[in-house]
Amino acid sequence: MKVSYNGLWKILIDKNMNKKDLAKACELSPATISKMGRGEFVSMEVLFRIGTKLDVDFGDMVSIIKQGK
């Protein structure tokens, strides 16, 4: 399985923010933002900080992509 952060990227567009703004607002490292851009897993703490700052739920930011067998 893979993870998609497309919901988060859409939220950023709606809030007129970019990834650099997100990193600064949530105190995230560039490496964490890069991992998310590549669809890699990040910690629940990171998702919690983002959700709290942007006032959104996990499901609004992240979706699971099921891969074929």
Predicted regions and their residues:
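The alpha-helix within a helix-turn-helix
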Residues: 12, 23, 51
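Key DNA-contact positions within bacterial/archaeal DNA-binding proteins
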Residues: 20, 31, 59
